[in-house]
Amino acid sequence: MTRSPFRRLVFGTLRRLLYLWVRSETINQSSFTLNLDRSRPVFYALQSPSISDLAVIDTECRKAGLPRPVLSVAVGNLIEPAAFFYLTPAPDWLGRQDKRGAPPTLERLVAAVSQNPGEDAQIIPVSVFWGQSPDRESSAWKLLFADSWAVTGRLRRLVSILILGRKTRVQFSAPIHMRELVGENKGYELTLRMTQRLLRVHFRNLKSAVIGPDVSHRRTVVKGLLDEPLVKQAIIEEAERENITQDKARDRALSYGNEIASDYTYSVIRFMEVVLSWFWNKIYDGIKVSHIEGVQEVAPGHEVIYVPCHRSHIDYLLLSYLLFCNGLTPPHIAAGINLNMPVVGSLLRRGGAFFMRRTFKGNPLYTAVFTEYLHTLFIKGFPVEYFVEGGRSRTGRMLQPKTGMLAITLRSFLRNSRMPIVFVPLYIGYERVLEGRTYLGELRGATKKKESIFDIFKVIGALKQRFGQVSVNFGAPIKLAEFLDGEQPDWREQALAPQFRPEWLSETTHRLGERVAQHLNEAAAVNPMNLVAVALLSTQRLALDDQAMERVLDLYLTLLRAVPYSPHTTLPEGDGRSLIEHVKGMDLLAEQKDALGKILYLNEQNAVLMTYYRNNVLHIFALPSLLASFFQSSSRMSREQILRYTRALYPFLQSELFIRWPLSELDEVVDQWLAAFVEQGLLRFKKDVYVRPEPSSREFVLLTLLSRAIAQTLQRFYMAIALLLNSGQNTLSAEQLEDLCTVMAQRLSILHGLNAPEFFDKSLFRHFIQTLLDLGVLRKDSAGKLSYHPMLGELAEGAAKRVLPAEIRLSIRQVALHSNEEEQDAGNGEGVA
């Protein structure tokens, strides 16, 4: 571009003609505008010459109020006729590219900044994407002309504009400050080469993040797996073990590869985008996305592994849709083999799904092929998505992580760590989960059914209901190298070949799973359904006066804003009244009027369903609820008493609910909550003692309701402890204790009218027992029988009586005693027989 009015007129005319057809948008504009110093000159760096790219960039700059690339710019005495340059020269008509020196504009810019110490300039790398897709050998017509890793000629670009111009995206990146580079005093030539290198690396990483790495065709990838040393060795061993020829074993490995591998197809991604845009805005009230800018910043140059929580089958589609719409490559998604069914399986596979069997046991050849396929994706930098929980959570809680995929990922990284791996937690919060009604049976204790994509079709008749909004929060990324540095500082120096299974792999993988789960919970999206569920399920009759409900919700909002759970947690906008109206509009909150006003309540079916939404945020309410529990049996407590009992119970809550704070930070967080309680009148601080309100006061009622959020969890803990203490040392195995706890919980739920089937969830008791073992409170003898530390009795009689009412403790002890007697009678009967 020059100062020539004629050239500017021609460019303006071409831009207007281009936009008769082209539609463009800017990706992640805030990420670079926040770092942009508008008082300093701006230059735009384009990867290669393209008048169409320049026209699109100029248009987006005008829309955003940014300096335009086609206008002149001054740096000291240097006046450039245009504020852009091309890093590489233009290809010829056959697409061939000639390598030359540095761009003249960049040469003059480096010289100007070097010669004038008071001057600075900003270089903004900017890319235009005409469609997004990884490069493939065969695909849809549009894919032929989408942006790829091939050098683009003029004819190809013209066709790209015609076919893909209505889906054009512009990515501005964070500015590079020339003063910082020149300030390193490396001289003109070295600074110039360093700037070029920075820009080349940047463009390569950005292209990988947006359109995907340069990967081969599926057939080539699958066949390539068979030539990898670990798979070749597995083929030899399979032939020997099964007494078959190596050719047959190789064919078997090839069939496994074809069963596993995705068939990522851009046309299917675009088709899903259209369908899902309708779905999220027609069935749901849209998607609210938070903190995605962190992913956009970390994706370039990293192998990104997305680890969402798993609440619904539509989770599979949600992330791919969101990433595509925000200019990031949709991931390869790990899906259960049960979803590889006719039509549906093909669609999912072409949308990026790769399929895995539920168990790899007894099939080392399959294990080798699957592991090698995943390793191939990782080292090529292709984003991957898998669910650390394994299956969908039917209770709304974060399930205990399944470590299989994490272990494969760790082993792959130990094998080749050149491509840094980063885990990106992803919290998905539904105001109404699509399969909610199908979960009811399992919430009532029915046997879990085998997962099937057809579960979606079972709820088609319910689509007339209002489903509310979907919230998607991206959590704090976890860089695997940094995690390993903390767990195993010398992991890089260890000799790990040939299987890459160090002794510490299992324990480290377990801790990685816990870290991922904690980061997922940190990113929780609290919605109106969650808060209404917490409030109403804490009442004895599942009902509250309309005004009382408003006060409770206002209190919860105030507390959660005063003591944020984490920077990645989001809260609903508005006040208690707006939350009530929102949930009433979803037909989950019933209303009854009388002479004194309105009563809001839950019917039996909705009460069970609402436990799901309460459990979504139980980890957020656990600590304040525990603190409130202390003041149900004690009218006053010192800070030291509160901290002592909190420290005693917190490890069990943290382990079950994946609460974020380590024990070293607990005291500080407790102080923050106590200060918030005092601020809201829930406690008074008098002479170094915290005092509860009068039992007849409104504040005490609010404190009591808050304490009940975690009450059933504490009751389950006490049940297991009471059964152990009544049974005596070395009497019960872990499995027997687990069974007794389940039966006891079922009995108590009937006696006390608890309408929460998860109260007797066997897996929760199993995890509590394991936590006692991990903490050294329990031990197993050679026969597998449990013995306990004296501190177990102190926990029962010290901390438990502070948080559980006397009548509840008495009832639990009586049922525990009766259960032990029945167990002994059954054992004696078996002995006589």
Curated annotation (Swiss-Prot):
Its EC number is 2.3.1.15. It catalyses: sn-glycerol 3-phosphate + an acyl-CoA = a 1-acyl-sn-glycero-3-phosphate + CoA. GO terms for cellular component: plasma membrane. InterPro entries: GPAT/DHAPAT, GPAT/DHAPAT_C, GPAT/DHAPAT_LPLAT, GPAT_PlsB, Plipid/glycerol_acylTrfase. Keywords: Acyltransferase, Cell inner membrane, Cell membrane, Lipid biosynthesis, Lipid metabolism, Membrane, Phospholipid biosynthesis, Phospholipid metabolism, Transferase. Pathway: Phospholipid metabolism; CDP-diacylglycerol biosynthesis; CDP-diacylglycerol from sn-glycerol 3-phosphate: step 1/3. GO terms for biological process: CDP-diacylglycerol biosynthetic process; fatty acid metabolic process. SUPFAM superfamilies: Glycerol-3-phosphate (1)-acyltransferase. It is found in: Cell inner membrane. One of its GO terms (molecular function) is glycerol-3-phosphate O-acyltransferase activity. It is a peripheral membrane protein. Pfam families: Acyltransferase, GPAT_C. The HXXXXD motif is essential for acyltransferase activity and may constitute the binding site for the phosphate moiety of the glycerol-3-phosphate. Belongs to the GPAT/DAPAT family. This is Glycerol-3-phosphate acyltransferase. It comes from Pseudomonas savastanoi pv. phaseolicola (strain 1448A / Race 6) (Pseudomonas syringae pv. phaseolicola (strain 1448A / Race 6)). The lineage of its organism: Bacteria, Pseudomonadati, Pseudomonadota, Gammaproteobacteria, Pseudomonadales.
